[in-house]
């Protein structure tokens, strides 16, 4: 027994020297471990799990902005276990019977696989995981680019711990970082006072993590100047918001590139439309505000927040479940606060104000059916009736629009009806509903994001690429071969980017499983393109596609152009037969981005009509809707006018001129963008211009009047001065004696001022009659009169 123990002691240091890796950073030393990725003889990867980047947001720090983590220089940090996940406030239904009434079988299966990763929850959850491929040596010349993953699905649940970055790091030869950030009410408790809003603490977590990474990445062999931020679903929305956030540019940008998968801040669900309503409802449920309030706004916001900070996380989570959020919208989500989110995304992404947004390299990926998880499993199998389609579309119109609802509803039904199949088969109707929800909630906003980023009005150095992921994972599909649903489903892109199909065998414990040989080839293609983009901002560079695997030969010969007007909005369709196509779902995108906004805009600008004109038929019948509807109110989509945009960097620092294009290529600003920007600035700008012009006219008139009075006074002064000079020269008065208009008028001759006898008449030149008579008499006498001979006042008066 002693020999065995001695042998273990002998070999243990050798094993640990291979398994353990220590890295010294400015925050302190961290100890991770080396693991071998599954499949294809990939190099080992050192993983450092559970590295803190923020102070535990509890007590007085709850609901507030993130604070950087304290340093641990006194002792090494053990980084071999993942941290607890953040509090999950809006978990999906886990009962199969109930879940299948609201979601697909594929999403239900994924939720169950994710559940084990969500069991250990805590508010102390601001941690990240770093995956570094092993190399022989590290120097400044071979620092690795970095990809930071922002997990998605929804704002209320999820974790970065569940996604293993070892395969992607080893295959792509990049550093992969996953992290946790506050979710739901803990990360997005929006509240508004009389003139400002706050509540984007979850986004501040991401900024805090990026700030720390920019400092410590060189210690891990990472390039802090080559960071890519990637996200899907709600995570993609957060990434796009950070692209336009001034807080990501303290000195230089905290990240250089971005990847958006099935999500954008332009989606209707991306921004909370009425945060104060949810804030006050939560305050009532927690007894932090009276229930008999008459207004959604309260001057004691700080007092209410302090009351909420005292409650336990369990109480808050239970209270959130009692708050109804309209279907297709988000309750506790990012808000426009003027700091992290300076303005509405439609404005921040525009060509006029989007200089920060447009200087980031962008790669966008869209699945074939991004709203697949929003259709119930039964409806996906057998189809949807016309009556249910009407309820779904009525809820969509009521929750997303305020004006001309009947006209918008009729337009949507007309657009997504298969007129070539007049029988209205339930599966045909299902396909129309699936396409409509995918287009309005995902596809159209993403295309609008791409167009704003690639607009040619002010050409920039950043690249813009798009791919449509159409590969089908056949083993996941529960549909029959003739179901009519083709292509990828919501969430399908993620496992292919992380390299899950390369794992050997299937396991129920894995987050994803059930892949075949074709799936493995597509996964290699996706990891190659993504790692290339992380390195250079171009999916095709710097490394060409390898031909050493079945799919590689096909993709090697396929060029991938940029998404812009000169290339006719080109994108790469990723299937086993890749093709470059143009104008992705252009007719449907035009319907949602141009026609519907114009129809809705006319309702705002036309003559006032009765409010009932904009209501749907049977507007208040609850059974005529699907899910939860927005309450009847006239509130605007933003509680207050957003603050003005911060100053943009000088154009010459962020953009470069481009040779002139034809007028058709320069026309990239869509009507929806103009409507969004116009609706925001039109009335306010018009009022400012009107008032400014009024003040300008008043000032000009006042200036003219003052100028005229001053000129008149000057002319009189000159006239008086001339008359005084003539008078003094004729009567012996020196100019030095009477050269001031402020002196008393001279009535007596200065030479006789001490005489008591009758003096010569001193005629004031200001006398219109006597002054002229005196001058005429003087001229007739040849100017030879002495003082004694001068005419008396009586002589002149006769």
From Swiss-Prot:
Topology term for the membrane: Single-pass type I membrane protein
Ranges of Low complexity composition bias in the record: 653-665
Ranges annotated as spanning the membrane: 686-706
Keywords: Cell adhesion, Cell membrane, Disulfide bond, Glycoprotein, Membrane, Signal, Synapse, Transmembrane, Transmembrane helix
Glycosylated sites: 164, 292, 315
GO MF terms, alphabetically ordered: neurexin family protein binding; signaling receptor activity
Protein known as: Neuroligin-1
Native source species: Caenorhabditis elegans
